[in-house]
UniProtKB/Swiss-Prot annotation:
Biased composition (Basic and acidic residues): 55-69
Segments of this protein annotated with the region Disordered: 44-80
Transit peptide: 1-24
Organism name: Mus musculus (Mouse)
Protein name as annotated: Complex I intermediate-associated protein 30, mitochondrial
Length: 328
């Protein structure tokens, strides 16, 4: 007599023969009929057989009622796409934005009355109060060139500040060319107007950069780019250092614009000149202190203000040999 293996899943398997019941739908389960000796089979009367068939038909009818018909799209049908309508809607949106810019310009700088702007002593340019404020920034690291540094930007737990964190690694990429690496940066997006025109910030009435930050004691480089040409030179910027104290307390950082020095591709240039404050394109923060490990920088807001006690125009000297245009 053959042995019968009964599984807990309701599948009956004979070790010599397997035959699935084709009448049952797939979702009912797999049942295999066993062909064992007649002495082990239960005698089924005609009444029991009729009742079992009735139950099976009722179960199949119940499953038929539960089936959901899905509307599968026909392969012959193609989605209707109107490029003319899309272009027209895009043009209408840009013209609407252009109209708003013209109306705001006629009202005054930044759409505010001129008297209010003249009397303004401080202005918050960037603050972090909701997740949409993070969309105005870009984070990058040497990972884009094969390095191992990582940087992330998110809102803090109380949604009242931005948390910039990650891991700095000075290990150069294994490309056979790079000898040094290890930087992480956070850069503000260039503002755009109607028809994707580049806009700029006008800080000409202010003389100091004002930040409220909380760090881990690492030094950061604050970079300001100015938009004075039709083609923006991304490697040319004005830079200055920002030193964080570390610890749980916030610190207010005030950097006069006269302290920013001109650099190109990370090198301080011999020819220096003051920062043009009415054509500010973006601001950024760079960490590259060659100290491997985790870091963080929490930022409450970034703004500008006028310090009446600061009268310096430019902190660095120029030689007529290096920059003769300033001495004509």
């Amino acid at each position: 007599m053959s042995s019968i293996h009964k599984l807990l899943t309701g599948i009956y398997i004979h070790k010599n023969f397997l035959r699935p019941r084709a009448a049952l739908p797939p979702f009912v389960g797999n049942h295999c009929v066993d062909y064992s000796s007649s002495s082990l089979q239960k005698k089924v009367t005609s009444v029991d057989r009729a009742s079992q068939q009735g139950k099976t038909e009722e179960g199949l009818q119940g499953h038929d009622h539960k089936e959901v018909a899905l509307d599968a799209p026909s392969p012959d049908r193609t989605p209707e796409v109107s490029f003319d309508k899309a272009i027209r809607d895009e043009a209408i949106e840009h013209f609407r934005r252009l109209k708003d810019e013209i109306v705001a310009h006629l009202r005054g700088p930044d759409g505010r009355p001129l008297q209010e702007v003249i009397m303004e002593q401080a202005r918050v340019v960037w603050q972090f109060r909701e997740k949409e404020d993070l969309d105005k920034w870009i984070v990058t690291s040497d990972k884009t060139i094969g390095g191992r540094s990582e940087i992330f930007l998110k809102m803090s737990k109380n949604n009242r500040s931005a948390l910039l964190y990650g891991t700095l690694s000075s290990e150069p990429p294994q490309d056979g060319d790079s000898r040094q690496s290890g930087y992480c940066a956070m850069i503000s997006r260039i503002p755009r107007g109607a028809f994707e025109r580049k806009l700029s910030y006008d800080w000409s009435q202010f003389n100091t950069l004002y930040l409220r930050v909380r760090g881990d004691g690492r030094p950061w480089m604050v970079n300001i780019r100015q938009d004075t040409e039709f083609i923006q030179r991304k490697n040319q910027m004005y830079s200055y250092f920002m030193f964080t104290r570390g610890g749980p307390y916030w610190q207010e950082v005030k950097i006069p614009f006269s302290k920013f020095f001109f650099s190109n591709q990370g090198r301080v240039r011999d020819v220096q000149g003051p920062l043009v404050l009415d054509k500010i394109s973006s601001i950024g923060f760079t960490l590259s202190d060659k100290v491997d490990g985790p870091f963080f920088l929490e930022i409450d807001f970034i703004g500008v203000f006028t310090d009446p006690a600061h009268t310096e125009e430019f902190a660095y000297e120029n030689s007529p040999v290096l920059n003769p245009r300033l001495f004509r």
